[in-house]
Amino acid sequence: MDPEAEEAQLRLEMELAKKAKADMSGLQRSSSLGLDHAGLYPLPLPPGWRSAPTSPLRTPSSPPPLQFPPAWAADVAGTSGSAAPEDDGPARNAGADEATAGSAPKNEDPARAAGADDGPTRSDYAAMMRMALAKFQDDDAAADDEEAASAVMEQAMTGLMDLTYRKAKPPELPYEFATRWPIPIAHDGTLQAEVMRDPVILPSGYSVDQTYQNNQKRQNPWTNTSTFTDHSLPYSLSVPNHLLRDMISAWCLDHSDLSPSTTSDTPSTPLEPSEEEQIQRILKLFSGNSASQREALKLIQLLTKTTKGVQPCLAKYADIIPVLINLRRKYKSSWTQDLEEERLTIILNLTMHRQNREILAGQNELAGAIKKIVKKAGNRGKRTSSLAKVASIVAVLSEFDMFRKRMLDAGGMKMLRGMLKIKDTEVITEAATAILALYADGEGEQPARFHEVPQMLLECHMFTDGILLLLDRLPKSPRVFRKICDQALQLVNIVMAEDASGPVTRKGILSAISLIYEIVERDVGKMNAVKNMEDFIERLRQLSSDRLPMQKMLQVERIIRTLSDAFPAPTVRGRCQEPSGSRLLA
């Protein structure tokens, strides 16, 4: 039966039911069927849940406790699926299709889509009404049967009206967008989710809120050893996850009921962004001492959070822009490094919205101001978090041609090359990403070659997606090519890493294949460092059976043919000292 016919049938049954009730005014009422209205509100995180799954849970309203995310994940922001690490906080990034989490399947019953998984649906109530109507029309039915039928009819009508006219369920916060630390606990012991404000990528490739990461660093300071080399690199902060942050912002714009303005950081007396007095107060505070300036910066940050619907604020408060850009020059007598850190954080947070990004990218003085910030940071000891934020700002705003050109003209490539010398994973990763953004459309090729960026990338003693992409795209001098040949074993190990986790994902693996192809074509003898060549060739065959771009497919086939000819299988078996089950090559 089509929906219109079913609705007409329900209306007829309701009219007949009303007439039947009028003829039986002496019958007593029975208790109505109760509905669980808890499903009308966003579901809390399951008790005992600590790590987010990689996509919205498709489970009943009371899912069992989860300890680890599933092994599948979407390829987002430089990560791909694998089992969760053993620490309790991190969670894999969500895929772009998960920004619409919480919507019901196309053919799902509306009642169940609203969260009432255990209650009657519209079809259930229609069946109850038909049964009661049949009992009314039965001339042989006893009085008790008619009384029971009247009660069933009333229950069905009440339930049907509730399903039809009740208030819509507020949007559920996708688990991937929820903060991991701190997580408040409700009176019933369940965990309450809040929108993740500042997602960062951990070295493992998992994303958490920066608040959680900072707490973990205070409790367990540690250093990292590069995945494919033996060099230890200290971590200051993790890498900002711009893509996940954009996804959260877009989701919040569509679901303003759960925007960050509803979280605990919102002041008890909200600002009135429409009042000019608030902006004038901020500008006045900037002319005071360090404490006043810090308060002004916090007020600006609140403006980015308390605007209804998480709307971008720079379009409304244009007077803030020159203050943020020129603040240190105007009030340098009372300026401190902590204030500089807060200013960079605010600018980076403002880039969350495309409208803000476009406004910032259009500022003529921003490129020069960024270069001065880096120079001052170098004079004061190179605070790594400041440098990483600067590189992150450059990477984000370089999507606009006007900013990219100004940054290159201001010496941005040389500035970012200098950051590659700092032995800090966050700074190196962000600097490589920014260089890749400046290199868009080949505009930065000449500055990159002039400042020997490829050589500096190889001296970082680490590989990430950004570094591998740059080494693949940038022109290589004979000296750089020799250094790449020296890294042949590390490149092979990257390709052999089947889980594609950590700092190198599938995108980086494809770039590693291109670099290996160049080595094989120009000097196949350098591949002699690979002891178990059969395993590597088998891995290449496995990759060739997957869906690869045509160019990569041809490169893989050429590598297999050349290596098979240069290193016949019997010779390889004679040289190999590795166990037959070994996958990583050494």
Swiss-Prot record:
Region of interest called Disordered, as start-end residue ranges on this chain: 21-122
Domain U-box: 182-258
EC number(s) given by UniProt: 2.3.2.27
Translocase in keyword set: no
Catalytic activity: S-ubiquitinyl-[E2 ubiquitin-conjugating enzyme]-L-cysteine + [acceptor protein]-L-lysine = [E2 ubiquitin-conjugating enzyme]-L-cysteine + N(6)-ubiquitinyl-[acceptor protein]-L-lysine
Keywords: Transferase, Ubl conjugation pathway
Single biological process term from Gene Ontology: protein ubiquitination
SUPFAM superfamilies (alphabetical): ARM repeat (SSF48371), RING/U-box (SSF57850)
Enzyme's top EC category: transferase
Pathway note: Protein modification; protein ubiquitination
Transmembrane regions: none
GO cellular component labels: cytoplasm; nucleus
Gene3D superfamilies: Leucine-rich Repeat Variant, Zinc/RING finger domain, C3HC4 (zinc finger)
One GO MF term attached to the UniProt entry: ubiquitin-protein transferase activity
Compositionally biased residues, Low complexity: 50-60
Protein role: Possesses E3 ubiquitin-protein ligase in vitro.
Protein name: U-box domain-containing protein 73
Biological source species: Oryza sativa subsp. japonica (Rice)
